[in-house]
C-alpha cells in the first residue's frame, strides 16, 4: 500500500469531530499530521490508528536519506583540538531523525511530552513527531503528570526512528540573559547523558 493511504487513515482519526478536510497532496497531509501530533492530547489511541501511523512512518523512512552514526567524524578527526572528550563528541548538521545509531539525545521539556507548540524544525518536536504517537503516549504513561528537573534524563525506545533508543534530557529553559546557573545546568545536562 501507498504511504498516503496509511496517513489518510491516521488523519481521519485525528480530525474526528472537526470541520477540517484532509488535503489531497501528500506534502500537505504530512504538514497537517505534523501539526496535529505535536498538539496531540488524546489517550487510548486505537491500535489500528497507531499501526497505520507506524506503517506510514516506516514507508516514509524508506524514502529518506539515512546517515550512519558510526561514520560521523568526531571533533578530533575534523579539527586540531584539545577539547576534553573530543574523541567522543561529533558535530553534525542535518535531520537527527535520519541518523542510524544506537541512541539519539533529545533536549526536551520537563513533562517529557515534547514541544507542544507545533513549531516545525525544533529538535524535540522532530524527534517526537517522527518516532510516532507511541512515544508521547509512552512518556505520558511514565510521567503520570509529574515533571523532571533540569539535567534529569529519561530513556525510551525510539519507535519509528532508525535508532534504537532516545535519551531525553531536560535542559535549562533560557529566557533572556544566560546566567551562571544556566551554564552549570547545561553542563550537567551534557554530563548526565
Give the ranges of each region predicted by the language model.
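Macrodomain-like recognition of ADP-ribose-binding/processing modules
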Residues: 1-193
Amino acid at each position: 500500500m501507498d504511504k498516503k493511504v496509511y496517513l489518510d487513515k491516521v488523519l481521519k482519526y485525528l480530525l474526528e469531530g472537526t470541520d477540517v478536510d484532509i488535503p489531497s497532496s501528500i506534502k500537505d497531509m504530512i504538514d497537517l499530521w505534523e501539526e496535529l501530533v505535536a498538539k496531540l492530547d488524546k489517550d487510548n489511541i486505537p491500535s489500528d490508528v497507531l499501526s497505520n501511523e507506524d506503517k506510514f512512518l516506516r514507508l516514509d523512512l524508506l524514502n529518506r536519506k539515512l546517515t550512519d552514526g558510526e561514520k560521523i567524524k568526531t571533533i578530533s578527526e575534523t579539527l586540531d583540538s584539545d577539547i576534553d572528550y573530543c574523541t567522543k563528541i561529533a558535530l553534525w548538521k542535518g535531520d537527527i531523525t535520519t541518523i542510524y545509531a544506537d541512541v539519539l539525545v533529545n533536549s526536551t521539556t520537563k513533562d517529557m511530552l515534547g514541544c507542544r507548540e507545533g513549531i516545525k524544525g525544533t529538535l524535540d518536536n522532530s524527534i517526537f513527531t517522527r518516532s510516532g504517537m507511541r512515544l508521547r503516549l509512552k512518556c505520558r504513561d511514565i510521567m503520570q503528570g509529574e515533571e523532571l528537573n533540569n539535567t534529569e534524563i529519561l530513556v525510551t525506545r525510539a519507535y519509528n526512528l532508525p535508532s534504537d533508543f532516545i535519551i531525553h534530557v531536560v535542559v535549562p529553559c533560557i529566557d533572556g540573559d544566560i546566567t551562571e546557573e544556566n551554564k552549570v545546568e547545561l553542563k550537567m545536562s551534557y554530563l548526565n547523558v
